[in-house]
Regions:
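PLP-dependent amino-acid enzyme catalytic core
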Residues: 1-224
Length: 224
């Protein structure tokens, strides 16, 4: 199946990597599974200062499909005073607020939209009330893909202003976030839209793990 495939967490049925996220047999969630290449800590030396330095450990097969806005490799700061207050000698804080859209959501959104590009999808979106909308819209703009943000109709517009500035289309849903999530899932599946935190979720969650890879590397691979 190539570099990676999808596997049902419950019954272990395997699938080609698509924007399928639920098993046809048992309705269990699908996870990305890798045919890991031979890598070690030296593999990642002298690479770009983004989370894409860990390309071999992410679910994109062709580097030409990477959609990057230079997120990742954020500062790891030793919190001396707070650590002393808490009785901890080695307390570190990972500052993902310096990512391009100011949150860790740039990691999963970037991986999901890169996969959407690799799969040939022509539009992406998300159900969000804030940070994810911004991250999805920014990456969609970089990829040249239309972006649809599903959010409650009574949301404070300031929460999605950044997403709108990137050209996102706001779809107002009467009801709660759960209602917006449900509508996003229905429209995404029926229209072939890659909704990053729903039908692209299997790939989306893979981006978050780069946080821990960076922490390990920034500690010279000597984790507490």
């Amino acid at each position: 199946m190539g570099k990676n495939h999808l596997e049902c967490r419950e019954c272990k049925k395997e699938y080609e990597p698509t924007f399928k996220y639920i098993c046809d047999e048992c309705f269990g969630p699908l996870d990305v599974k890798y045919d890991f290449p031979s890598v070690n800590k030296n593999t990642f030396k002298d690479r770009e200062q983004t989370y894409w330095r860990y390309f071999e450990l992410l679910p994109i097969s062709d580097k030409n499909n990477i959609v990057s806005i230079e997120a990742g490799m954020t500062p790891l700061v030793k919190a001396e005073k707070l650590g002393k207050e808490l009785g901890l000698n080695n307390l570190y804080i990972k500052n993902d607020s310096v990512n391009p859209t100011f949150s860790f959501k740039d990691r999963p959104a970037g991986v999901a939209i890169s996969k959407a590009k690799e799969l040939g999808l022509t539009a992406v979106g998300c159900a969000s009330t804030g940070n994810l909308a911004s991250a999805t819209a920014a990456h969609a703009a970089a990829a040249g893909l239309p972006c649809h943000v599903f959010a409650p109709s009574d949301i404070e517009m300031a929460k999605i202003a950044q997403a709108l500035s990137y050209g996102a289309n706001y779809i107002a849903v009467d009801g709660t976030y759960d209602d917006a999530n449900r509508i996003a899932a229905q429209i995404g599946d029926s229209k072939g839209i890659g909704v990053v935190n729903i039908n692209m979720r299997s790939h989306y969650v893979e981006g978050s793990k780069t946080f821990s890879y960076e922490v390990a590397e920034q500690l010279d691979w000597q984790v507490p």
